[in-house]
C-alpha cells in the first residue's frame, strides 16, 4: 500500500486537478481536489493519470505538428524527433517547459506539488457557492487517503472554515488512515466495485478483502457513507453482484447508493499516456438494467440514484 510517500514535508501532496463547480461528487456545488497515486489499477479507470503518484507528461500525437520546439528547449535532451516520430525517454524530469512552449497544446502536465495552504487558497475562492448550494469540498483521486498527513490537515482547516467535506475513497488503505480522516469528514463516498474476490483481482489488480473490511469498520465510527458502484457489462453488470452487495451492506451505515453506468470518455487519456485501453470486455449497461438495479436497492430500503 501507498502511505505518505510524496513530499519531504507532511503538508505537500501531488495533485493533478482542482475542479470547480463539481456537481457529481457530493451534495451541492463543490470543488473537487484530485490527488495522484492509487493502489488500484481498474481497467476502466476514467482518470488513468491519477494512478501513478509521480508527475507525468501527456502527449497528444493528433495535435502535434512536429515543429521541434519541445526538442530544442528540453534541458534533459529527453525529447527526440526522428523519422517523423516524437519520443520522450526516461531522463525526462517533468519540468513542464515543453508544455509551456507547445503552441499546439499537444503536451499536458499531470501533477503539481501543493501545500495545504495552496489548496485552501484555491478552494476558498468559491466559498459563496458552497454556502448558497449547501456544497463544499471533495477530496478524490487517485486515492486521497494515501496522502493522509496532508489530507488530515486539509480537512481540519476546511472544517475550521465551516466548509462541508467529502472524501471519495476506494478503501484500499490502512484503517488508521480512514479513522484519521473520519474525524473531519462529513460524508464518505466509498467505492465498491466487485464482490467477487477473484474478479476483483482480475479487473482491479488486488483483493477486495481490505476494502470490504474497512467499510465495515468505518460504519462503526461514521454514520454517513455514500456507496458508489460502477456498473459495467462484462465485469459486474449482473443481478448476482447486486444481490451480494445488498446482502453485504445490510446493517452498515449506508446513507445513499449511487449506481454509475460505465463510460469510455477517458479513452483518449490512455493514448496520451502511451497506454492501451482494454475495452474489449467492457460495455455500457442498458437504461432498463440500471433502473432495475436501482429498484433492487430501493426495495431493500436504500436511497438509490443512477449517476453521481
What are the functions of these language-model segments?
Residues 43-50, 69-87, 97-112:
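Iron-sulfur cluster-binding cysteine motifs and their immediate structural context
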Residues 14-16, 82, 168-172:
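Short gly/ser/thr-rich secondary-structure transition/capping motifs
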Residues 117-271:
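Conserved AdoMet/S-adenosylmethionine-binding subsite of the radical SAM
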Residues 15-69, 85-94:
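N-terminal pre-triad scaffold of radical SAM enzymes
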Residues 26-27, 34, 52, 56-61, ...:
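N-terminal-biased segments
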Residues 61, 201-207, 274-282:
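Short glycine-enriched, charge-decorated loop/helix-capping segments at active-site entrances
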Residues 5-27, 231-308:
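Auxiliary Fe-S-binding modules of radical SAM enzymes
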